[in-house]
A protein has these predicted regions:
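C-terminal helix-rich "cap/oligomerization" subdomain common to oxidoreductases
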Residues: 2-5, 40, 48-51, 169, ...
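C-terminal glycine/acidic-rich active-site capping loop/insertion
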Residues: 58, 100-112, 190-260, 267, ...
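Beta-loop-alpha module in the N-terminal Rossmann-like domain of NAD(P)-dependent dehydrogenases
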Residues: 1-45
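Rossmann-fold dehydrogenase core element
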Residues: 41-59, 79-82
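Contiguous beta-strand/loop segments that form the cofactor/metal-binding neighborhood of enzyme cores
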Residues: 127, 131-208, 238-252
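Hydrophobic residues in well-ordered beta-strands that form the structural core
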Residues: 5, 28, 53-55, 84, ...
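Predominantly a Rossmann-like dinucleotide-binding segment in NAD(P)-dependent oxidoreductases
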Residues: 62-148, 155, 279
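A short helix->loop->beta-strand "cap" motif at the edges of active sites that frequently abuts
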Residues: 22-24, 49-51, 172
Length: 284
C-alpha cells in the first residue's frame, strides 16, 4: 500500500515515480525532488492515482507547528508583512565529504556524497533548509515570488551557509539563514518570527529556549507552552511515519507535509541555487 523512499536526493524522483505508478502511497525523504519539473510530475501522478505524498519533515508534525498555523490562519496577527527564520545544525563534516560521525556505529552508513556532491543536490539548502521552508510554508500558507542568496562554500563546493532574502506574492518580505557551523551534541537552532499588521508570532525550538507566543499591538500576549526539550532537541520522524501508516490504512488523518508543500519547497530551493550561481535575484 505504501513505499518509503530514503535513497540519495538525486534518486528520489525515479524511485517515487515507480512507486506511484504501481498505485502506492509514497513517503519521500526530503527534499521531494531536486528540481521543479520532477516534483510537478510526482504531483500529477499522485492526483492521477489518488495517492498521497508525504515528506517526513518531523517539525511539521509537532503540535506547536499546528498551533502556530492556527494562530496565523485565524488572523490573530493580521496580514503578514515580514518573516525571519534560521536553521542551523552540526553538519560541517557531511558537507565537506566526511561521513557523519553520528553514524559510526550504525549498520549502514550513508554515502557522504549525498550531501557533499554539488552534482547530486548536495549542500545545506537541499539537505537542511528543506526542513525550514516546509515549516514556514505550513504555518503561513504564503507563496514565494523571488529570491536572492549568498553562501560560504565547503571544500567540495557545496553550500555550508545560506543568507537569503525573499519576496512573497502577497508583498511580504523574508530574511532566512542556514548554517552547518554548530557544535556537535547540541541539537541545533530553528526559529521562525512572523510579523503582521496587528502582532508578531515567535516560535523558537532551540533547546532551553523553546517558546510559542504572540505579542499583539494592544499589548496582550497569547502563549502556547512548549515543554523543554520538545523542540529541535527532540526532532524525530515517528509522528510522520505514524501518519503515513494511517494513510496506507485509509484512515482520515492530516498530512502536515504533503506533496503540494514539498513542491513549493523545491521551487524555493531550485531558485535559491540559481541565485547562488548567477549572483542575481531569481524568480521562483
Amino acid at each position: 500500500d505504501g513505499v518509503i523512499i530514503s535513497s540519495p536526493h538525486h534518486a528520489h524522483f525515479e524511485n517515487a515515480k515507480a512507486a506511484l505508478e504501481k498505485n502506492c502511497h509514497v513517503m519521500i525523504e526530503k527534499p521531494m525532488t531536486t528540481n521543479v519539473k520532477d516534483a510537478e510530475i510526482l504531483i500529477e501522478l499522485a492526483i492521477k492515482y489518488n495517492k498521497e505524498i508525504l515528506i517526513p519533515n518531523g517539525f511539521n508534525f509537532k503540535s506547536f507547528m499546528s498551533k502556530a498555523e492556527e494562530i496565523i490562519s485565524n488572523g490573530l496577527i493580521g496580514e503578514i508583512k515580514h518573516l525571519d527564520a534560521a536553521f542551523s545544525s552540526s553538519l560541517i563534516d557531511l558537507f565537506q565529504g566526511i561521513p557523519l560521525s553520528e553514524s559510526n556505529n550504525h549498520t549502514f552508513q550513508p554515502h557522504a556524497s549525498t550531501w557533499s556532491d554539488p552534482e547530486k543536490a548536495g549542500g545545506y539548502g537541499w539537505g537542511q533548509l528543506s526542513h525550514m521552508f516546509a515549516g514556514i510554508l505550513k504555518i503561513t500558507n504564503l507563496d514565494p515570488e523571488c529570491i536572492f542568496c549568498l553562501s560560504v562554500p565547503s571544500p567540495t563546493k557545496v553550500d555550508y551557509t545560506n543568507a537569503i532574502s525573499m519576496k512573497f506574492t502577497n508583498g511580504a518580505t523574508g530574511s532566512f539563514s542556514g548554517s552547518a557551523f554548530v557544535p556537535k551534541n547540541f541539537g541545533g537552532t530553528f526559529y521562525i518570527t512572523i510579523h503582521g499588521t496587528i502582532g508578531t508570532l515567535y516560535l523558537d525550538m532551540e533547546i532551553k529556549r523553546e517558546r510559542l507566543f504572540v505579542r499583539l499591538n494592544d499589548e496582550n500576549i497569547i502563549e502556547h507552552k512548549i515543554k523543554e526539550g520538545d523542540g529541535a532537541y527532540s526532532y524525530g520522524t515517528k509522528e510522520a511515519l505514524n501518519t503515513f501508516v494511517d494513510i496506507c490504512l485509509n484512515k482520515n488523518v492530516t498530512n502536515h507535509s504533503n506533496g503540494e508543500l514539498a513542491l513549493k519547497t523545491v521551487k524555493i530551493l531550485e531558485a535559491m541555487y540559481k541565485s547562488l550561481k548567477s549572483k542575481k535575484l531569481e524568480r521562483i
